[in-house]
């Protein structure tokens, strides 16, 4: 196994099976963040992740963290909160503000560089990247964004400025995603937060098999049209 240097003149990627074991999933470096290359990456279970000042790094870890949306873990305390939720949840109302919120609210330091923000904004303009917003009155208090692959949604990042805001984003999205034919959410690498919400690890090969099938399954017509998904309970 060796790290592959990508060419700027080809958007092809090596097989994810050739990714390094340590660091887990590192597959390639270089290339660019053009829409065509990003879409090629997601179609093959690969995503970019790198720190400011580093070259672009491409990953496909094994195991892979995923969330079956029907298995979202709704704790008793979160259920009580949601039943009296003060939040309004929307879809694709404020993509730029959501990715900016994610970039500026990472305790461990952001990996969302200006280049990443610009690249995913282009994907959003092309209809491939989407945001879920959580509002309290007129204030954006949380949200998440990711990339659609048919009936699979590749979650990229989330943020929260008030209690349970990011959990609310994922909870409401899961319910809506299921209703419109969504089957699986890619969480990339398991962490304590996503694990607490029901995410699990599966072998990379299983994830790639799911991806190959689900990306060919369309969601219900006009699912990604901007709209309100949830209104406050009080």
From Swiss-Prot:
Protein's cellular compartments: Cytoplasm
GO MF annotation list: leucyl-tRNA--protein transferase activity
Enzyme class: transferase
Listed GO biological process terms: protein catabolic process
Pfam families (UniProt xref): Leu_Phe_trans (PF03588)
GO terms under cellular component: cytoplasm
EC number(s) reported in the record: 2.3.2.6
Record's catalysed reaction(s): N-terminal L-lysyl-[protein] + L-leucyl-tRNA(Leu) = N-terminal L-leucyl-L-lysyl-[protein] + tRNA(Leu) + H(+); N-terminal L-arginyl-[protein] + L-leucyl-tRNA(Leu) = N-terminal L-leucyl-L-arginyl-[protein] + tRNA(Leu) + H(+); L-phenylalanyl-tRNA(Phe) + an N-terminal L-alpha-aminoacyl-[protein] = an N-terminal L-phenylalanyl-L-alpha-aminoacyl-[protein] + tRNA(Phe)
Classification via InterPro entries: Acyl_CoA_acyltransferase (IPR016181), Leu/Phe-tRNA_Trfase (IPR004616), Leu/Phe-tRNA_Trfase_C (IPR042203), Leu/Phe-tRNA_Trfase_N (IPR042221)
Keywords: Acyltransferase, Cytoplasm, Transferase
Domain of life of the native organism: Bacteria
Role according to the record: Functions in the N-end rule pathway of protein degradation where it conjugates Leu, Phe and, less efficiently, Met from aminoacyl-tRNAs to the N-termini of proteins containing an N-terminal arginine or lysine.
Similarity comment: family membership: Belongs to the L/F-transferase family.
Protein name: Leucyl/phenylalanyl-tRNA--protein transferase
Native source organism of the sequence: Salmonella paratyphi A (strain AKU_12601)
Gene: aat
